[in-house]
C-alpha cells in the first residue's frame, strides 16, 4: 500500500509542467518608459521601474559580451544576471563601459 502511494505521488510530481525559465534579467540604473525589444535571440521586456527580463534561449556568447550588448541598447545597469548567476560589481563596471562609448 505504501509503495503504491509513493508511486502515485511521484507520478503527480513529475507530471507538473516546469515553469517558464527566464533567460536573463537586468536592472537599469536610469529607468524610463516601458519597452520591449527582441535581440540576440531573447525577448527583452523592461518595465518603467527599470526591471528588465528576457525570455528565450539567447545567442551562445559569454555573459560579459551579452551584458555589453544589452547596455548599448538599454543603458547602464546596476544588476545583470543570466541563468540565475549575477555579475559581480567588477564585472558590472566593465560591462557598463559599453554604454558610454
Identify the residue ranges that each predicted region occupies.
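Post-signal/leader-peptide non-cytosolic segments of secretory proteins
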Residues: 20-100
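Classic N-terminal secretory signal peptides
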Residues: 1-21
Amino acid at each position: 500500500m505504501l509503495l503504491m502511494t509513493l508511486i502515485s505521488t511521484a507520478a503527480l510530481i513529475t507530471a507538473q509542467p516546469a515553469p517558464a525559465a527566464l533567460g536573463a534579467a537586468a536592472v537599469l540604473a536610469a529607468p524610463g518608459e516601458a519597452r520591449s525589444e527582441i535581440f540576440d535571440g531573447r525577448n527583452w521586456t523592461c518595465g518603467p521601474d527599470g526591471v528588465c527580463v528576457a525570455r528565450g534561449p539567447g545567442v551562445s556568447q559569454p555573459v560579459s559580451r551579452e551584458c555589453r550588448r544589452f547596455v548599448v541598447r538599454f543603458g547602464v545597469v546596476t544588476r545583470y544576471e543570466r541563468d540565475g548567476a549575477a555579475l559581480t560589481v567588477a564585472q558590472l563596471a566593465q560591462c557598463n563601459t559599453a554604454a558610454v562609448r
